[in-house]
Amino acid sequence: MAKLSVILLFRSLLLCGALTVSRHATLVTEREVQSSKYDFIVVGGGVSGLTVADRLTEIPDVSVLVIEAGPVDRGEDFVYVPGSYERDPYIWPGLTNEPSAELNNRVFDSVVARVAGGGSIVNAMIFLRGTALDFDGWESLGNHGWGWEGMLPYFIKSENFTRPTPELAHEGNITWDDSVRGHDGPVRYSYPNYIYPGLGRLYEAALHIGIQPRLDPNGGQNTGVFNQPFAIDAATWTRSSARRNHYDPAVSRPNYHFLSDTTVARVIFDGTRAVGVEYLPSRGGGISTAFAAKEVLVAAGALHTPQVLQLSGVGPRDLLEALNIPIISDLPGVGSNLQDQTTFPFVYTWDSAVTPNVTTFLTNTTWATEQRVLYDQHLPSVWTLTRPLAPKFAFLSYEDATANTAYASILDDAQARDPADSLPGDIHPTVLAGYAVQRQIMFNEFRDAGLAVGGMSWDTDANVQVFNVKPFSRGYVYINQTDPLANPVIDFRTASDPTDFQLHIALLHKQRELFNAPSLAALGPTEVVPGPAVQTDEDIIKLMREILQPSNGHQCCSAPMMPRELGGVLSPEMKVYGTTGLRVIDISHWPKELSGPPMASIYAAGEKAADIIKGEHGWLGN
């Protein structure tokens, strides 16, 4: 009877039409939501959700409600001043993964934002795109228009790039290609205005071992050595977040409501049509409902979008039946295909460290205070760098990573491996089929010299992070209860495909080669971790099981945009198979991980999603 009442209420709203909401600021209370009507409900106010909501509400007659599980930040220094960076206050609490079988059953916290603006509030601000091959790989999975040529206009539309000064560009060997950068979009980005002096030696070392400069890592190829652009507003030298770029400018629109600190429990359906959502306070409380006359757009993130779908009856049949959830659409791919980028740490001491460096910043309060004075005067300052990062990065192709090592056969061994051996034994045949196709695409990508599979980042003193950005392993995220406030079951299944260990071994040796180059060797580095005793593959893998990090906070791909017969969940228009009026518009819709940090690509994909939605409703010219 309760469900019937909900549907009858929704139908009565449809008869009245989706009226424009009352004229007040976007941030609203639950009571105000109950007295309003909406065309669209966006589940999640992260980068994707805010981008799409902003673009839809540019049309005055289109009303949108965004429901975000977290708060709106208060403009704290630890968010907006890069040198004060602290992510923990806005991280989802208690979100841990299952014991990782290949990592000695270690348990890790999953880093997920719970705040308006999502990852753009808590990440390290790196603003790199995926490569042309990354997106062409998406398109080859049946997603027409999602290749590089289809995405590049949306990168340009989303961005507002500020060029560095000639002096900074010369000092930091910063180069770029203006023709592929956007200059009129909402998302401001540039380069921090301070260069640690030791980074010049890293640049020389990279050149010495054959890593070439990259003119522009955002131009479709991202291998080489380069300075990373950051999501920083060069007018204020503060973090450029989705909250500031896509929320603040729209805050006074009467057709845009934002409900914070509120969790969506499930999508409401009339048959197979999504008509609204149930929601409750994130701290706990009673269930309320809101209705969408046109569509529900899910953007809850790669770990929570599958949870929302599964709680709503969209997901693997066996899972839903076990929890007595009525099945709306049997989609085995919901929650499968989870991916993230792994990190292996190096630790060094130095006989002659180049200073000032990151340790100077962290430990010398006098110097740090002097630098803060410069920052507050908008002068060059270390405070424009996301603490404790340095902007120089070396990204390696598969060929670069394995050159001059005994590991050139890694890819051949991977191709000989049965894809089923890398997935759970009970995996659905369609998901297995999709994974097998993804592997073939990845094998082709890895042969290209312009696509990065891994890289190194040095903080200018003790710490180096070595990344595998294109893992073969696939994990999952599933619910095990119907409480919408309970965390889902998460397992990255790191190194379930041993190719990922082998690639990390090759990258480890490449890192050692880099620091043995004359410009860095002259400083007298001593490798503490892994340490000189760790040499054999067996020793390296043993250590990786102890210290490898399975998540870089770049979770993706858990509701993939692929054909249904390949375990896909979404059409190329991001529509959920077996339903109407329901789309997934966040990073969950990616079929496979990109070769770099995701933020810039999330903005661009959000712009594309907004245009797809506008086009289908006849609003594209608005």
From Swiss-Prot:
Using the UniProt annotation, give the residues that carry a glycan (glycosylation sites): N160, N173, N357, N364, N480
Pfam families on file:
GMC_oxred_C (PF05199), GMC_oxred_N (PF00732)
**PROSITE patterns to which the protein is assigned, alphabetical:** GMC_OXRED_2 (PS00624)
What are the alphabetically sorted keywords of the record? FAD, Flavoprotein, Glycoprotein, Oxidoreductase, Signal
- Any GO molecular function: flavin adenine dinucleotide binding
Pathway(s) per entry: Secondary metabolite biosynthesis
Q: What does this protein do?
A: Dehydrogenase involved in the conversion of monodictyphenone to the prenyl xanthones such as emericellin, shamixanthone and epishamixanthone. Monodictyphenone is first converted to variecoxanthone A via a paeciloxanthone intermediate by the consecutive actions of the FAD-dependent monooxygenase mdpD and the xanthone prenyltransferase xptB. Variecoxanthone A is further prenylated to emericellin by xptA before being reduced to shamixanthone and epishamixanthone by the dehydrogenase xptC.
Report the family membership: Belongs to the GMC oxidoreductase family.
Known EC number:
1.1.-.-
- Keyword rRNA-binding belongs to the record: no
* Cofactor or coenzyme needed: FAD
User: Would you say which domain of life the source belongs to?
Assistant: Eukaryota
Q: How does it assemble?
A: Homodimer.
Residue positions annotated to bind FAD are V47, S48, E68, A69, N123, A124, M125, I126, P598, M599
Q: Name the source organism.
A: Emericella nidulans (strain FGSC A4 / ATCC 38163 / CBS 112.46 / NRRL 194 / M139)
Query: What name is this protein filed under?
Result: Dehydrogenase xptC
Phenotype of gene-disrupted mutants? Impairs the production of the xanthones shamixanthone and epishamixanthone; and accumulates variecoxanthone A and emericellin.
| A single BP term in Gene Ontology | shamixanthone biosynthetic process
* Signal peptide bounds: 1-18
What InterPro entries does the entry give?
FAD/NAD-bd_sf, GMC_OxRdtase, GMC_OxRdtase_N, GMC_OxRtase_C
